[in-house]
Regions:
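Short loop/turn positions at the edges of beta-strands in beta-sheet-rich folds
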Residues: 1, 43-45, 154
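Surface-exposed loop and membrane-interface regions of Gram-negative outer-membrane beta-barrel proteins
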Residues: 23-33, 58-63, 172, 176
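Detector for outer-membrane/organellar transmembrane beta-barrel domains
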Residues: 36-148
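A short, acidic, flexible beta-alpha connecting loop/helix-capping segment that sits on the rim
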Residues: 58-61, 96, 164-170, 179
Length: 190
């Protein structure tokens, strides 16, 4: 999204943003005329409940049956417990057409359902999410996985991070390559 125009509007609990790519010439359509928009409404119908809809379109995608957009819809609910601890739960449905890493086949199209929870208590925050994918090429191209992580605030300027992620690949790529990674980090602000 280099060389693009962005417009954002905030009014109360409503937030709207739109972006339009203008930087490429007609011979290079990497971002020329690509577009995206998003709408967020906080405290929708009840306190702490938010909805988000977003969509972006890539005009450089060509070929029969290749989807040229990503679209997502998210529901989030925030809770504050009597102890002061906070919990956030969310669900996101994503119609994917532009991300080749979510599925194991050559086609980038499919749908993913994400489920997650975040718990915050004092200086610690813990998060877990699970993604269940459905590749358009068939069930052997799905890639389902989970992410788990936490950070602990050691002081005003230091934090420690721990995370683990695992993604189980379908057998459609011929290699059945699963992905797994672990992160340990220390951050200090000067």
């Amino acid at each position: 999204w280099r060389e693009s125009m962005l417009y954002e509007l905030k009014s109360g609990n409503l937030r709207f943003a739109a972006i339009y790519g203008v930087g490429e010439n007609s011979n290079n359509t990497v971002t020329n005329k690509d577009s995206g928009f998003g709408i967020e409404y906080k405290n929708f119908l009840m306190p702490g409940f938010s909805i988000v809809y977003a969509r972006n379109k890539d005009h450089s995608v060509t070929g029969a049956n290749n989807q040229n957009y990503n679209e997502k819809f998210t529901l989030t609910k925030d809770f504050k417990l009597a102890s002061g601890n906070k919990i956030k739960i969310w669900y996101m449905h994503e119609d994917v057409g532009l991300d080749s890493k979510l599925f194991t086949g050559s086609n980038s199209d499919g749908e993913v359902n994400w489920y997650g929870i975040r718990y915050k208590t004092g200086p610690m925050e813990f998060q877990y999410s699970y993604g269940d994918s459905d590749a358009n090429e068939g069930p052997t191209y799905d890639r389902d996985g989970y992410n788990i992580g936490m950070y602990y605030k050691l002081s005003k300027t230091s934090r420690i991070y721990l995370a683990h992620s695992k993604s189980d690949a379908g057998s459609g790529d011929g290699a059945n390559l699963d992905i797994e990674s672990t992160l340990i980090g220390l951050r200090h602000d000067f």
